Each structure stands twice: as structure tokens, then as C-alpha cells.
Amino acid sequence: MGRDTIADIITSIRNADMDKKGTVRIASTNITETIVKILLREGFIENVRKHRENDQFFLVSTLRHRRNRKGPYRTILKRISRPGLRIYSNYQRIPRILGGMGIVILSTSRGIMTDREARLEGIGGEILCYIW
């Protein structure tokens, strides 16, 4: 795990998805917990539980699977703003992913939220990642 916890989440989920694993283990921080709750609420993952191991907390999340096929859904996650190049947007210029089918996760002054929530509240922020 590196210093960019958001990139670590995205990489862990993407690698587990490509490797057809059912669960992902992610180091638990406030940012990772909030992003995983958004993914759970939006239906990209099925289940999340907090696991403690040697005085460290981990989030164990179950990836969403198709009903008739054994493999997980192909979830595409893309990191946008990174430590070397921050990308900011006001609420009017937040991009729509696949015409509203995907989501944009933003870090705003009121916390981490999706693009729909930011548009409703009329606030912009740092674009963390795209998910579709």
C-alpha cells in the first residue's frame, strides 16, 4: 500500500475483478470507508465488513456477481485527480459518465460524494475517480 489510498482502492478492486476473485481486502481509513460506502450504495459492490487483524483494520468487500455467470461484473474504475496533478471542477462542469449511467466521486468541502449529490447541493470539488 502506498501513500495514495484512493489509487490503492481502485487498483485492488480492478485487480480482483480481472482475476475473478469474489472479495477484496482494503486498508481501512476514513477516505476508503467513505468511498466503499458510496460503491455499496450505488451497487458496484455487494457487501462490506470491517475486519481487525493485529491492531489494524481492513475492509473486506464482496464484488457484485452476475446471476447466470460465475464472473463478477466488469467494473471500470479510473483515477482522475492524483497527488501530482489535481483536477477540480465546479458543480456545473462535473462530467456525466455514459450519460449518467456511471458515477463520478468527488471530494468536496462537505465530504466525499457522488456527482449527483454534488449537483443537487450546488457544490464542486476535486474529481477523484470515474466508475462505470
Curated annotation (Swiss-Prot):
Name of the protein this chain belongs to: Small ribosomal subunit protein uS8c
Key word Electron transport present: no
Source domain of life: Eukaryota
UniProt GO cellular component terms: chloroplast; ribonucleoprotein complex; ribosome
GO terms, biological process: translation
Gene expressing this chain: rps8
GO molecular function, one term: structural constituent of ribosome
Family: Belongs to the universal ribosomal protein uS8 family.
PANTHER family found in the cross-reference section: 40S RIBOSOMAL PROTEIN S15A (PTHR11758)
Compartments where located: Plastid, Chloroplast
Species for this entry: Nandina domestica
Assembly notes: Part of the 30S ribosomal subunit.
InterPro entries: Ribosomal_uS8, Ribosomal_uS8_CS, Ribosomal_uS8_sf
Pfam families associated with the record: Ribosomal_S8
Family matches, as HAMAP family: Ribosomal_uS8_B
Function recorded in the entry: One of the primary rRNA binding proteins, it binds directly to 16S rRNA central domain where it helps coordinate assembly of the platform of the 30S subunit.
Keywords assigned by UniProt, alphabetized: Chloroplast, Plastid, Ribonucleoprotein, Ribosomal protein, RNA-binding, rRNA-binding
